[in-house]
């Protein structure tokens, strides 16, 4: 688990993010309380203890396995990066061991959730993928065989402050699921409130024991 704290003009904002590990026989589903901190010093070292309440479930079945990589300014895996500059191209490579479905969301510094995949041209709200096939999303040149080039949404990272942190949620399941209800915004991906996104995600993960979520953190600087 990771807790991220940002201080802006004397106001502290806290985000709690759960990152699954292969040696943990459980999966974090939802945070239901604000983290509580205990700060102390021992032998000149800063010690921070954190406690948080939430919902989790036992892993009782073999999970769908997938690999997702954030790519900067290139579509090959050697371009994997979590550090972007404003204006950089954003791509994502994805490969799953099983056929199924995938969605991608971005959470920005302002706590807005943006649906990056399915693309805005999607009519059924889901993206079906084949097993053992490498896909690169957000590039019209790699649209085939899932999409036509004109259907692809391409993205350049932007930064209004000196530096920003974004969270990329890659959601994968062998079972069909449909994107969250969202709103069209001119010049931006479809958008919904972060709280509504979390409710949608928790509902789907509770209903689908095979659904997996990987959260990737990227920084964007001017």
What are these regions (language model features)?
Residues 2-222:
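Secretory-pathway glycoprotein ectodomains that are cysteine- and/or Ser/Thr/Pro-rich
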């Amino acid at each position: 688990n990771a807790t991220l704290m940002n201080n802006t003009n004397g106001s502290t904002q806290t985000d709690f993010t759960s990152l699954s590990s292969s040696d943990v026989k459980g999966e974090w589903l939802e945070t239901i309380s604000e983290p509580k901190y205990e700060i102390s010093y021992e032998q000149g070292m800063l010690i921070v203890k954190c406690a948080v309440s939430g919902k989790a479930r036992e892993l009782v079945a073999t999970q769908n396995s997938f690999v997702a990589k954030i790519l900067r300014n290139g579509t090959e895996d050697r371009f994997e990066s979590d550090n972007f500059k404003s204006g950089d191209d954003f791509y994502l490579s994805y490969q799953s061991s099983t056929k199924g479905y995938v969605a991608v969301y971005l959470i920005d510094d302002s706590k807005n959730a943006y649906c990056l995949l399915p693309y805005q041209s999607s009519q059924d709200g889901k993206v079906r993928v084949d097993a053992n096939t490498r896909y690169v999303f957000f590039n019209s040149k790699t649209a085939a065989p899932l999409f036509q080039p004109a259907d692809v949404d391409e993205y350049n990272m932007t930064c209004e402050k000196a530096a920003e942190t974004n969270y990329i949620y890659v959601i994968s399941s062998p079972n069909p699921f449909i994107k969250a209800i969202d709103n069209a915004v001119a010049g931006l991906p479809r958008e919904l409130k972060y709280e509504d996104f979390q409710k949608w995600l928790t509902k789907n993960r509770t209903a689908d024991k095979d659904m997996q979520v990987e959260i990737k953190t990227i920084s964007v600087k001017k």
